[in-house]
Amino acid sequence: FCRILDEAYDQGVGFLVIEPAKGEYKDVFGGLDDVHVFGTNPAFTPLLRIDPFSFPQGIHVLEHLDRLVEIFNVCWPMYAPMPAVLKDAISRSYEDCGWNLTTSENSFGEGLYPSFADVARNVREILDSSEYDAENKGAYKGSLLTRLNSLTNGLNGMMLTSDGVDDATLFDGNTIIDLSRVGSTETKSLFMGLIVLKLQEHRMAAADGMNQPLRHLTVLEEAHNLLKRTSMEQSTEGGNLLGKSVEMLSNSIAEMRTYGEGFIIADQAPGLLDMAAIRNT
């Protein structure tokens, strides 16, 4: 794929590489003057910083909220009421920050968004006031709060911040995002999903028409981390939530082509990719 990127670069087509495995692209392209490299270890690269809760002007808060919940459904094991609890907690967190979920306006002014600490607090309050029995309540709180709290401290807390890298820097130029040093597969998938979400909304907000020629190319390496093959069988916990979420994410990637965004979905084990992703190539 380096040759394809090289040719795109020569023709003035910008690129974004999301690399969760080896970190080789930064060695090939990282030395070029107009290529930005971001990673997860500030000793080697500038730190990737994104705000999962912010969205560009022109995107409705509920649009963003739904897409964000789909990312969590893909990346975290969810069962029974957990997706609904998480969505409710995120909704309340936006309202706590002054957002009107109907008008998508903030009474405190622009630029104020919730954090994972806000969401964790609301998850706890929702479950504490629920009618689930103590055993299930403890299981749901343990699963959700452990994951949410892990995103508020350490490197995750430094990267998932309100002081994010400008979207234009990430998505309009030439950028390599090296996630190869992230240890947790769940966290790696989450970062990949959040980047794709931010890219999608950036393209939608900046769109100046449909069926645009190729303007930008995104390479999604080891794509099974995000677009993993799932069983199509219904489960006793309320249906194939993961499969539906992966399919929606795959469709979002396909729909970005109308804004001039090209995608290369790469994987050494294509059998691990969901069929929805393969159909869209």
How would you describe each model-predicted region?
Residues 255, 265-270:
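Conserved helicase ATPase motor motifs in RecA-like P-loop NTPase domains
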Residues 3-261, 277:
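P-loop NTPase motor domains
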